[in-house]
């Protein structure tokens, strides 16, 4: 067996060719980031998979990355109001991820959540979500540009500051009190889940990063897209996160 740990990357259900083909897919940057900065071997976990198959996968990997996705977690998982009919959903991913999180926790396996991933962890621990953050009093518009011709640089540009909480993991990691991040999300954390800890808040008070209380391994989840060019100087925190995740996976493997 190879010396590097294996990380399972959650996929999304993508509908192609007017519904004639459905694929399990994830963004190339997630795969690239875990290979280059976490130094792990990536495998893709289908967004639709039986629980017993999932158990077999978890026996053979050493960490899980919960990726972002176009669809939002359906509100019936946290007692919210029903989505409008045109809201993108991914019920298979909802079921799979809300199943995989407690399995990972029971194994004390490293877990890293990004964008939708932080929301899934919060819901898994009994928390709730805002459907539209920008419609809440005092909250910013955290969404990406709405125009069709927006460039990737415009979509992923650094948008707002996040402030680290008093005993935040991030303060220890980079010896700073805050950091500037991108922002591409419509939903966000409302009520914090049980046994979760707030690690960072945005300037408008929205929860931007969490961890699992007293977890013996890496359990960081962030609302921003840490996978976007971690190698850039302005994104050095994100590079550190992937490196720390990789070290935790290696420790878990050993």
Task: Locate the predicted segments by residue.
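A short helix-to-beta-strand connector/capping loop
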Residues: 177, 215-217
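Short, basic/aromatic recognition patches
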Residues: 183
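Conserved G/P- and acidic residue-centered "switch" motifs that form tight phosphate/ATP-binding loops
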Residues: 115
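N-terminal beta1-alpha1 cap of cysteine-dependent amidohydrolase-like domains
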Residues: 1-112, 123, 127-130, 134-173, ...
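Active-site-proximal beta-strand elements of phosphoester/diester hydrolases
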Residues: 220-223
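The feature captures the ABC ATPase H-loop/switch
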Residues: 118
């Amino acid at each position: 067996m190879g010396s590097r740990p294996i990380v399972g990357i959650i996929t999304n259900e993508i509908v192609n060719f007017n519904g004639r083909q459905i694929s399990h897919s994830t963004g190339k940057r997630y795969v690239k980031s875990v290979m280059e900065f976490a130094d792990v071997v990536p495998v893709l976990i289908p967004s639709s998979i039986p629980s017993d198959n999932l158990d077999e996968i978890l026996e053979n990997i050493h960490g899980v990355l919960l990726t972002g996705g176009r669809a939002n977690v359906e509100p019936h998982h946290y007692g919210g109001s029903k989505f409008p009919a045109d809201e993108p959903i991914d019920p298979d991913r909802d079921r799979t991820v809300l199943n995989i999180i407690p399995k990972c926790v029971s194994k004390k396996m490293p877990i890293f959540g990004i964008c939708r991933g932080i929301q899934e962890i919060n819901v898994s621990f009994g928390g709730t979500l805002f459907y539209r953050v920008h419609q809440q009093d005092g909250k910013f518009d955290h969404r990406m540009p709405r125009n069709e011709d927006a460039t990737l640089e415009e979509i992923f540009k650094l948008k707002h500051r996040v402030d680290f909480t008093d005993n935040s993991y991030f303060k220890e990691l980079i010896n700073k009190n805050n950091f500037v991040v991108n922002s591409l999300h419509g939903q966000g954390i409302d009520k914090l889940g049980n046994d979760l800890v707030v690690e960072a808040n945005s300037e408008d008070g929205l929860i931007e990063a969490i961890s699992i209380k007293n977890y013996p391994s890496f359990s960081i989840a962030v609302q921003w897209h840490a996978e976007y060019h971690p190698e850039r100087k302005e994104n050095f925190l994100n590079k550190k996160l992937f490196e720390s995740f990789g070290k935790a996976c290696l420790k878990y493997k050993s």
